[in-house]
C-alpha cells in the first residue's frame, strides 16, 4: 500500500480490533458471559501508521507472539472461529520476508522531516494528557480498555514470552572469594557448601555413602560412584596400544608407562627408578635394618641367617613375586 502524503510503501497493516459484543437485550455496554476470555482480550492490534513504523524483525516477533498466544488459548479450551488476525498472519507471508522494506531506511512518518516530527511530538503530548483525564465513557464501562502506546503491548508480550521460556543453559554463578565456604578444621575453602560437607567427613572419619551391593562405605559420593562401576563390570578406560581396559583412569596412566618406558618414581636412598609407586615402596624394604635377610641370601648369593625386620612387620604383598627389587642396590 502506498501513502500518497509521504510517497512511501507501507506494508499492509493487520486487521483492526473487533468491536465488543452487544448485550442481546440492547444495552450499550460491553456484554460477555461470566469468565469468558477471547483472543481479542489478549491480542495486540496496530493501526496502519503504527504498523508502518515496525521493523521486519519486530513484525516477525509480533507474528510469533500472536500465533503462540492463540495456541495457548486453544490448549486451554477456548473455542470459536479463527480470529481474523490469525488468518491475516498466515496469509500475508511476504510481510515476514527479511528483505522487506525497513522503515528506518525509508524514514518512518514520524521522522520524515523536523516539522512533522515536532508536530507528532505535540500530538503525542496532547494524547498523553487526554489519557490522564478520566473518560466518561470509559468510567461508565469498566470493561473498555484505554488506548495504549504503539509498542507497549508488543514489548510486554515479548517480555512475558522471555520469562516463560525455560532457561536450559543457565549455569549457577561461581561464588566470589568472600562468599566461599571454609573448613573450620584445616582452613581449606570450597565454592559449594555440599563440597565442604563431604570434606568435613574426611576429618571426622565418617563414611556416609554406602554401597548397596557390598556395604562398603565412602566419604565422597564420587568415590561411591566409581566403586559401583566395579560391581557393574565397567571398564571405560582402554589402552590405545594394546586394547587392555581399566576401571580407573589412574590405572590406565600407570599401565601406559609399560609402553613408554617411563619411570618417574626414584628411590631416595639408591636412585633406582620405577614405573609404579608401589614398586618403589616394595623396593625400599631392602634399605630397612635387616631387610636383606628376609630372602635368606645377600646380593652376592651367600646364604645368611634370617634376621627379623624392625617392628616384626611383614614385607608388602608381592615380595615373593618381585624378589629382584628387594636386593640391596650397589
Swiss-Prot record:
Molecular function in Gene Ontology: zinc ion binding
Entries under InterPro entries matching the protein: KRAB, KRAB_dom_sf, Znf_C2H2_sf, Znf_C2H2_type
Annotated zinc fingers (C2H2-type), start-end: 181-203, 209-231, 237-259, 265-287
Keywords: Metal-binding, Repeat, Zinc, Zinc-finger
Any single GO BP term: regulation of DNA-templated transcription
Taxonomic superkingdom: Eukaryota
Residue ranges with Basic and acidic residues bias: 114-126
Residue ranges, annotated region (Disordered): 1-32, 99-150
Ranges of biased composition (kind: Pro residues): 12-23
Annotated PROSITE patterns: KRAB, ZINC_FINGER_C2H2_1, ZINC_FINGER_C2H2_2
SMART domains assigned: KRAB, ZnF_C2H2
Sequence ranges assigned to domain KRAB in this UniProt record: 37-108
The protein's name: Zinc finger protein 747
Organism: Homo sapiens
Gene: ZNF747
